[in-house]
């Protein structure tokens, strides 16, 4: 059975769940008010093998590292280990999201092209929307083709804040 260590931390944008495995690889990072969605994703990815959630304090130092990100040490999120469920395509999208540098954005079509799947922007968008590791797998760095702040599971206001925090100038 998979044991997931969890802690809820305070951030400038509200409480954030940090969930990792016993090897301290992030499995989920989600805003508190979307915890039902997080549980649904955990069930989808790990119900078959079974999992239990265990309260922990700063598991593997991950909570402190996320606090550092919010305090301005932006590059720290690039160092955080992750382990995700999902389909092979979803994992490919999520891995590619981590290559978008802090302070930069990409639109869904560009991300699809980078994956070698031109024309798959909608599929990329769907995979982006089911990302269980918010912020660390930076789905907030993907915007609409015309520069619009398209959907972000944590809310568009958070997306805008995160992009400003990372130095992306919003017009």
From Swiss-Prot:
<dbReference type="GO" id="GO:0006307">
    <property type="term" value="P:DNA alkylation repair"/>
</dbReference>
<feature type="active site" description="Nucleophile; methyl group acceptor">
    <location>
        <position position="139"/>
    </location>
</feature>
<comment type="function">
    <text>Involved in the cellular defense against the biological effects of O6-methylguanine (O6-MeG) and O4-methylthymine (O4-MeT) in DNA. Repairs the methylated nucleobase in DNA by stoichiometrically transferring the methyl group to a cysteine residue in the enzyme. This is a suicide reaction: the enzyme is irreversibly inactivated.</text>
</comment>
<keyword id="KW-0963">Cytoplasm</keyword>
<dbReference type="GO" id="GO:0032259">
    <property type="term" value="P:methylation"/>
</dbReference>
<dbReference type="Pfam" id="PF02870">
    <property type="entry name" value="Methyltransf_1N"/>
</dbReference>
<dbReference type="GO" id="GO:0003908">
    <property type="term" value="F:methylated-DNA-[protein]-cysteine S-methyltransferase activity"/>
</dbReference>
<protein>
    <recommendedName>
        <fullName>Methylated-DNA--protein-cysteine methyltransferase</fullName>
        <ecNumber>2.1.1.63</ecNumber>
    </recommendedName>
</protein>
<keyword id="KW-0808">Transferase</keyword>
<dbReference type="Pfam" id="PF01035">
    <property type="entry name" value="DNA_binding_1"/>
</dbReference>
<keyword id="KW-0489">Methyltransferase</keyword>
<dbReference type="InterPro" id="IPR036217">
    <property type="entry name" value="MethylDNA_cys_MeTrfase_DNAb"/>
</dbReference>
<keyword id="KW-0227">DNA damage</keyword>
<keyword id="KW-0234">DNA repair</keyword>
<dbReference type="GO" id="GO:0005737">
    <property type="term" value="C:cytoplasm"/>
</dbReference>
<comment type="similarity">
    <text>Belongs to the MGMT family.</text>
</comment>
<dbReference type="InterPro" id="IPR001497">
    <property type="entry name" value="MethylDNA_cys_MeTrfase_AS"/>
</dbReference>
<dbReference type="InterPro" id="IPR008332">
    <property type="entry name" value="MethylG_MeTrfase_N"/>
</dbReference>
<dbReference type="InterPro" id="IPR014048">
    <property type="entry name" value="MethylDNA_cys_MeTrfase_DNA-bd"/>
</dbReference>
<dbReference type="InterPro" id="IPR036388">
    <property type="entry name" value="WH-like_DNA-bd_sf"/>
</dbReference>
<dbReference type="InterPro" id="IPR023546">
    <property type="entry name" value="MGMT"/>
</dbReference>
<dbReference type="InterPro" id="IPR036631">
    <property type="entry name" value="MGMT_N_sf"/>
</dbReference>
């Amino acid at each position: 059975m998979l044991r997931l260590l969890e802690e809820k931390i305070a951030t400038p944008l509200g409480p954030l769940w940090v969930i990792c495995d016993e090897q301290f690889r992030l499995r989920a990072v989600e805003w508190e008010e979307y915890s039902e969605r997080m549980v649904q994703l955990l069930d989808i990815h790990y119900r078959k093998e079974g999992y239990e959630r265990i309260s922990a304090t700063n598991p593997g130092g991950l909570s402190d590292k996320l606090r550092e990100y919010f305090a301005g040490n932006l590059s720290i999120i690039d160092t955080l280990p992750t382990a995700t469920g999902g389909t092979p395509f979803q994992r490919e999208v999520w891995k590619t999201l981590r290559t978008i540098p802090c302070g930069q954005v990409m639109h869904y079509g560009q991300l699809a092209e980078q994956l070698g799947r031109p024309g798959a922007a909608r599929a990329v968008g769907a995979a982006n929307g089911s990302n269980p590791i918010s912020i660390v797998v930076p789905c907030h760095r993907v915007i609409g083709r015309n520069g619009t702040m398209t959907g972000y599971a944590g809310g568009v206001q958070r997306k805008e804040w995160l992009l400003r925090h990372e130095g992306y100038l919003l017009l």
